[in-house]
Amino acid sequence: MVKIRLTRGGAKKRPFYHIIVTDVRSARDGRNIERVGFYNPVAQGGEKRIELDLARVDHWVKNGAQPTEKVRNLIKEATKSQAAAA
């Protein structure tokens, strides 16, 4: 089964997450199929908080990938922000 989930990066006390498409059997920071965006929960100033390639996310969801609960919320937030920017 394929999932869309977060993989952690960044420094201690300053997390940064990549949003990836991966097999459920892979480790959290292990191999991934595709990187579709990022999430920066501690963004400051002009830094982007979320960047997501919604076309690729939609492609993977149509092909059976299941987003985790947190990623599902991030997709909704990114969709709202892109609609507001347009």
Swiss-Prot record:
Q: GO biological process: what's one of them?
A: translation
Q: Which Pfam families match?
A: Ribosomal_S16
Superkingdom in the source lineage? Bacteria
The Gene Ontology CC terms held by the record are:
cytoplasm; small ribosomal subunit
Gene3D superfamilies in the cross-refs: 3.30.1320.10
Where does this protein have coiled-coil stretches?
Answer: none
Which Gene Ontology MF annotations are present?
Answer: structural constituent of ribosome
Xref: InterPro entries: Ribosomal_bS16, Ribosomal_bS16_CS, Ribosomal_bS16_dom_sf
For this UniProt record, give its keywords in alphabetical order, as a comma-separated list: Ribonucleoprotein, Ribosomal protein
Record keyword Lipid biosynthesis present: no
Q: Which SUPFAM superfamilies match?
A: Ribosomal protein S16
Is Ribonucleoprotein there in the keyword field? yes
Q: Which family does it belong to?
A: Belongs to the bacterial ribosomal protein bS16 family.
Q: Which PANTHER family match?
A: 30S RIBOSOMAL PROTEIN S16, SMALL RIBOSOMAL SUBUNIT PROTEIN BS16M
Please give the name of this protein: Small ribosomal subunit protein bS16
Protein source organism = Stenotrophomonas maltophilia (strain R551-3)
Lineage start: Bacteria, Pseudomonadati, Pseudomonadota, Gammaproteobacteria, Lysobacterales
